[in-house]
């Protein structure tokens, strides 16, 4: 609807330019917002106040001219002027009802992408291999997954890339320790303890550390024995990751892995190409690119180091190779990097070097989708009681058990297998939703009690809200798609619910544009609250007429489908009953 109003305003402005009321050459960004007070309409625009000065008119006088020039539209019942010159638009409820009927008949709920369909690379999760995933990997994994789901729903061609840390000095350390302590695959599956023991040996023995560094060189040179052991470590690590992804209900598979090692063969070429473009400067033996846009506190340009003095490559080199691959080989239109916002400087530098070096041959927007940290109750990074790193799988297991105990207490008569299933859906959903509902760039404190609460903006509340809608249809023995008739919007609670339902597409396009799933969370929470008010004030099963019952059932069906689809786009499973 906002796009429709923008188009109407644009047509009016074009008419006013033709009439000489407005000067030529104006290209204003027409803003249309939801009206705060429904008595003043459904949508508002400040365009008259924006253009009053170039028009040489008072805002209200210009607003009158704009309203007079607005084309008629079946979607708008009337437009009015408010305050200093706001334009307020009232939706036509019959047109709104028709849109919702069409949405209910559509597999995509009437949602379409606002712009052209694109090929989008999502760089997400990216754990370091050779040890298990920890809680620090949660945000990149689930935020990236949710945005990828939304983009796919809108029609984009999404390529997920799990840029795992599968190369580097830690593997030399592990290989050296494995040489000293040959063990079985079963023993090796306990990666955390094996890594800890190898790290202890590395820190305590200079001879061991020297041998480990030598094995890194052999590994990088393609030594068959080293490569075989490295592959063994990598496969075990990835199997650990895959179990976590499956428990999280995240759409990442082995086929999506494109780790650091995948770019090894191109690293020397990256350095050579930077040199041929005249971008490299040697500094203390290292090969660097200096960019004037990025300076230290003394005002000196910061180096982007692509090759160390000993010939080794760095993260920047690998990331530059990845940019080139994603642009030139994958032909991506966008590349979204879901990486901790503390890496913002790194990515801004890499993106600028890539542009200057001509590595972005196919026009590709590069966007760092940074995020804040998940902290403990004390506001510090989340740790175990003894200060260790919390394994992600352990956190999720605890969430399942806590949710199971909570559900069993409320529903002791349910069968054990159903209790376990509900516990898993609620527990995993609670952890994910608590994260996704926060603004991506914000830090937040992890709190089981808050996230498992059945009140407030939580997964349990939304999951229960969905089962409440499903329960209406279960009583009737019908599905969401088995309701005849048409939507008729008469009561205020019907109109409020309908207006919010109609905004689903706008919300999803917002998430796709900015990479912010919390916007979808807020929408679903608001929608659930509006349905609750509608359900309490507009009887469905006890409606006054058959037509009224069908209309309200159709509103309920569209609410149920929207809640289910929205939760699925967040990566949350739903339940038919709790």
From Swiss-Prot:
PROSITE patterns: AA_TRNA_LIGASE_I. It is an enzyme of class 6 (ligase). Its main location: cytoplasm. CDD domains: ArgRS_core. Its EC number is 6.1.1.19. One of its GO terms (biological process) is arginyl-tRNA aminoacylation. Pfam families: Arg_tRNA_synt_N, DALR_1, tRNA-synt_1d. Keywords: Aminoacyl-tRNA synthetase, ATP-binding, Cytoplasm, Ligase, Nucleotide-binding, Protein biosynthesis. The keyword Cytoplasm applies. GO terms for cellular component: cytoplasm. It is found in: Cytoplasm. It catalyses: tRNA(Arg) + L-arginine + ATP = L-arginyl-tRNA(Arg) + AMP + diphosphate. Belongs to the class-I aminoacyl-tRNA synthetase family. NCBIfam families: argS. This is Arginine--tRNA ligase. It comes from Pseudomonas entomophila (strain L48).
